[in-house]
Regions:
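Conserved catalytic cores of soluble enzyme domains
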Residues: 128-250
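A structural preference for short, pocket-lining loop segments at secondary-structure junctions
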Residues: 81-93, 109-133
């Protein structure tokens, strides 16, 4: 049996088997950045129910429940911070908010994080934890794939470093857009990384797929992920990458 106090001491990683539990966005930020350096931007951005969408629950009711449970307005937090003294633009997704799904607000925050990185020529770091596009926002959600990719491609074209961190899970529209195109793609151990589920994937290509093909280790072995990094080493790894990617002043 594991107790929360034990897990808090190990960054929510099981000390026995190494399983990485999902963590809230603000906890992730505290683990990565220099103490007290994070300045959140656009915390007041609020999703709207443009479609009047109702499934088992009306979308506004679902949003309110998620906001009360997480203390967030939506499933992403972005801002600027320092990591080992280097200023970065950081966007972190929170799976606890409607499965970390990307709607108009999440897409806008990812885009604004990229725009800030571009404007100030500071590294962009995005930590993904998402079930994909938010179905309650329909086409508005799908539009975010294009918007986020457009900004990220401009960041890369300007030779501003982009580090993508994929955590469990990184799936659907987030996988199909910005999460997989970092200058360096990092994944946590055994993270679920995929576009669609087993049944859909197998049915689409008409053949049985290999075991573990949707896990970080498979993607790493095929060159899709550059590094698999345990949570306890993630800050240290990012510090090393920033030192490598950022040119020293002339």
């Amino acid at each position: 049996m594991l107790f929360n106090k034990q897990l808090d001491k190990t960054l929510r990683v099981c000390p026995n088997c190494g399983h990485h539990f999902r963590i809230p966005a603000k906890v992730r930020i505290e683990q990565l950045v220099d103490s007290g350096s994070f300045v959140e931007r656009d915390a007041d951005l609020q999703p709207v129910d443009a479609l009047g969408f109702v499934d088992l629950k009306a979308y506004p009711d679902r949003l309110m429940a998620a906001q009360l449970a997480t203390g967030l307005r939506d499933a992403a937090v972005w801002g600027t911070a320092t990591i080992d003294g280097r200023t970065v633009s950081l966007c972190v997704m929170d799976f606890g908010f409607i499965g970390g799904s990307m709607g108009s607000v999440v897409g806008e925050k990812v885009a604004r994080a990229g725009e800030a990185a571009l404007a100030d020529r500071i590294p962009l770091i995005i930590v993904s934890s998402s079930g994909g596009a938010r179905m309650q926002e329909g086409t508005y959600s799908l539009m975010q794939l294009v918007k986020t990719m457009g900004v990220v491609e401009r960041v890369k074209a300007a030779r501003v470093p982009f580090i993508s961190v994929m955590t469990d899970p990184t799936t659907g529209g987030v996988f199909a857009s910005f999460a997989v195109v970092g200058d360096v793609n990092i994944a946590e151990p055994n993270a679920l990384i995929r576009f669609a589920g087993d049944r859909v994937s197998a049915g689409t290509i008409g053949e049985e797929l290999p075991p573990g093909y949707q896990r970080a280790e498979f993607w790493f072995s095929h060159g899709f992920v550059d590094r698999i990094v345990a949570r306890s080493r993630l800050r240290e790894e990012i510090i090393s990458l920033l030192a490598f990617l950022i040119a020293p002043p002339l």
